[in-house]
Amino acid sequence: MKGIAGRQTRGLPLGANITCADNTGARSISLIDVKAWHGKARRIPAAGVGDMFMASVKKGTPEMRSKVVYAVVIRQKRPYRRPDGTMVQFEDNAAVLVTPDGEVRGSEIKGPVAREAAERWPRIAAIASIIV
Protein backbone atom coordinates (compact mmCIF):
# COMPACT_ATOMS: atom_id res chain seq x y z
CA MET A 1 0.00 0.00 0.00
CA LYS A 2 1.30 3.43 -0.96
CA GLY A 3 0.31 6.78 0.53
CA ILE A 4 -1.83 9.39 -1.22
CA ALA A 5 -0.46 12.91 -1.63
CA GLY A 6 -2.68 15.86 -0.77
CA ARG A 7 -6.15 16.09 0.71
CA GLN A 8 -8.83 13.63 -0.19
CA THR A 9 -12.60 14.12 -0.49
CA ARG A 10 -14.16 11.39 1.61
CA GLY A 11 -17.67 10.66 0.37
CA LEU A 12 -18.66 7.55 2.38
CA PRO A 13 -19.56 8.09 6.07
CA LEU A 14 -20.21 5.34 8.62
CA GLY A 15 -23.30 3.31 7.74
CA ALA A 16 -22.98 3.91 3.98
CA ASN A 17 -24.23 1.03 1.82
CA ILE A 18 -21.66 0.14 -0.81
CA THR A 19 -21.84 -2.18 -3.82
CA CYS A 20 -19.31 -5.00 -3.75
CA ALA A 21 -17.67 -5.05 -7.20
CA ASP A 22 -15.91 -8.42 -7.07
CA ASN A 23 -16.81 -12.11 -7.26
CA THR A 24 -16.43 -13.05 -3.57
CA GLY A 25 -20.15 -13.66 -3.01
CA ALA A 26 -20.95 -10.37 -1.25
CA ARG A 27 -23.29 -8.02 -3.15
CA SER A 28 -23.85 -5.17 -0.70
CA ILE A 29 -21.74 -4.11 2.30
CA SER A 30 -22.20 -1.49 5.00
CA LEU A 31 -19.27 0.61 6.24
CA ILE A 32 -18.67 0.17 9.98
CA ASP A 33 -15.11 1.48 10.58
CA VAL A 34 -12.41 3.32 8.62
CA LYS A 35 -8.85 2.09 9.12
CA ALA A 36 -6.23 4.77 9.92
CA TRP A 37 -8.90 7.43 10.51
CA HIS A 38 -7.49 10.44 12.40
CA GLY A 39 -10.32 12.93 12.59
CA LYS A 40 -11.65 15.69 14.77
CA ALA A 41 -13.54 14.92 17.98
CA ARG A 42 -17.19 13.92 17.44
CA ARG A 43 -16.80 13.94 13.66
CA ILE A 44 -18.24 10.90 11.91
CA PRO A 45 -15.45 8.92 10.20
CA ALA A 46 -15.67 8.72 6.41
CA ALA A 47 -13.84 6.81 3.68
CA GLY A 48 -12.76 7.98 0.23
CA VAL A 49 -11.30 6.39 -2.89
CA GLY A 50 -8.38 4.11 -1.99
CA ASP A 51 -9.20 3.89 1.74
CA MET A 52 -9.35 0.56 3.54
CA PHE A 53 -12.33 0.06 5.84
CA MET A 54 -14.18 -2.61 7.79
CA ALA A 55 -17.66 -3.54 6.62
CA SER A 56 -20.53 -5.85 7.38
CA VAL A 57 -21.93 -7.92 4.50
CA LYS A 58 -25.64 -7.09 4.13
CA LYS A 59 -26.55 -8.98 0.94
CA GLY A 60 -24.84 -11.93 -0.67
CA THR A 61 -24.43 -15.67 -0.41
CA PRO A 62 -25.47 -17.30 2.89
CA GLU A 63 -21.80 -18.02 3.73
CA MET A 64 -20.82 -14.35 3.32
CA ARG A 65 -23.86 -12.66 4.89
CA SER A 66 -23.40 -10.89 8.26
CA LYS A 67 -19.61 -11.42 8.22
CA VAL A 68 -17.25 -8.55 9.11
CA VAL A 69 -14.77 -8.05 6.26
CA TYR A 70 -12.07 -5.62 5.10
CA ALA A 71 -12.62 -3.70 1.87
CA VAL A 72 -11.08 -0.91 -0.25
CA VAL A 73 -13.11 1.83 -1.97
CA ILE A 74 -12.61 1.75 -5.76
CA ARG A 75 -15.40 4.18 -6.84
CA GLN A 76 -17.33 6.96 -5.10
CA LYS A 77 -20.31 8.99 -6.22
CA ARG A 78 -19.19 12.22 -4.53
CA PRO A 79 -17.04 14.31 -6.92
CA TYR A 80 -13.37 14.76 -6.02
CA ARG A 81 -10.61 16.83 -7.60
CA ARG A 82 -7.42 15.41 -9.06
CA PRO A 83 -4.11 17.32 -8.89
CA ASP A 84 -4.45 18.36 -12.56
CA GLY A 85 -7.76 20.10 -11.74
CA THR A 86 -10.21 17.61 -13.26
CA MET A 87 -13.25 16.57 -11.23
CA VAL A 88 -13.99 12.83 -11.09
CA GLN A 89 -17.34 11.28 -10.18
CA PHE A 90 -18.64 7.74 -10.66
CA GLU A 91 -22.19 6.40 -11.03
CA ASP A 92 -22.07 4.36 -7.81
CA ASN A 93 -20.12 3.68 -4.63
CA ALA A 94 -18.17 0.44 -4.96
CA ALA A 95 -15.52 -1.52 -3.08
CA VAL A 96 -13.60 -4.79 -3.33
CA LEU A 97 -13.02 -7.19 -0.43
CA VAL A 98 -9.42 -7.59 0.72
CA THR A 99 -7.50 -9.35 3.49
CA PRO A 100 -6.12 -7.26 6.38
CA ASP A 101 -2.73 -7.11 4.54
CA GLY A 102 -4.32 -5.80 1.32
CA GLU A 103 -4.48 -8.98 -0.79
CA VAL A 104 -7.60 -9.05 -2.98
CA ARG A 105 -10.01 -11.86 -2.03
CA GLY A 106 -11.78 -12.10 -5.41
CA SER A 107 -10.34 -12.86 -8.84
CA GLU A 108 -12.17 -10.25 -10.93
CA ILE A 109 -13.47 -6.68 -10.53
CA LYS A 110 -16.67 -5.51 -12.22
CA GLY A 111 -16.62 -1.99 -13.66
CA PRO A 112 -13.96 0.73 -13.63
CA VAL A 113 -11.44 1.36 -10.83
CA ALA A 114 -10.32 4.87 -9.85
CA ARG A 115 -6.68 5.63 -10.66
CA GLU A 116 -6.08 6.70 -7.03
CA ALA A 117 -7.10 3.26 -5.74
CA ALA A 118 -5.06 1.46 -8.42
CA GLU A 119 -1.90 3.45 -7.59
CA ARG A 120 -2.26 2.86 -3.86
CA TRP A 121 -3.13 -0.87 -4.09
CA PRO A 122 -1.05 -2.65 -6.81
CA ARG A 123 -2.94 -5.95 -6.27
CA ILE A 124 -6.22 -4.21 -7.18
CA ALA A 125 -4.60 -2.65 -10.27
CA ALA A 126 -3.39 -6.09 -11.39
CA ILE A 127 -6.91 -7.54 -11.70
CA ALA A 128 -8.76 -4.35 -12.74
CA SER A 129 -10.23 -4.43 -16.25
CA ILE A 130 -10.58 -0.62 -16.57
CA ILE A 131 -8.64 2.08 -14.69
CA VAL A 132 -10.09 5.60 -14.95
From Swiss-Prot:
Pfam families: Ribosomal_L14. One of its GO terms (molecular function) is large ribosomal subunit rRNA binding. One of its GO terms (cellular component) is cytosolic large ribosomal subunit. Disulfide bonds: none annotated. InterPro entries: Ribosomal_uL14 (IPR000218), Ribosomal_uL14_arc (IPR019971), Ribosomal_uL14_CS (IPR019972), Ribosomal_uL14_sf (IPR036853). Binds to 23S rRNA. Forms part of two intersubunit bridges in the 70S ribosome. This is Large ribosomal subunit protein uL14.
